[in-house]
């Protein structure tokens, strides 16, 4: 049992390193400001990390939620709750005011150049294929994002959706925009590891 636990946290550290490496190869860095509404849980991931701290690592919490337990959770807790970064709508993608972040913030819908999975499948696309091969100059998006790791703020009745952003023809990258049915919008540039709020 102990070996399984140690292996899980060792693999989490390796996964974090791999994600950081991929993010360096797929770089987009907009201007950010500290969020006024959200904080993210940061745990030191090593063999001394407790289950609760490791489970909360990377989760985003509403600053104004009185039910959030603040670190330290225990005597030797090394966790922090830090403001996440926020990006003004229109700056989170390389499309400016024609980008998904701007459109979702101001019009509550994706721009017209997005195509859904059913539309792609009708063109012959299958999972693993490059979307641009079947729909040139279109971007893939609109699927439900299940938030299984609960990193994004969770609430009864909240549904998350996702779409690709910032990719060049022929190649999907690690950049995604995520939005909820109740108006929250976040982006990630390292495939769901780190999130930025859209303001």
Question: For the regions a protein language model found, what residue spans apply to each?
Answer:
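Catalytic nucleophile-His microenvironment captured as a short glycine-rich beta-strand/loop
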Residues: 75-82, 176-177, 194
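Functional cores of ribonucleases/endoribonucleases
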Residues: 33-44, 50-54, 123-199
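Generic hydrophobic, helix-prone segments enriched in Leu/Val/Ile
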Residues: 100-104, 177
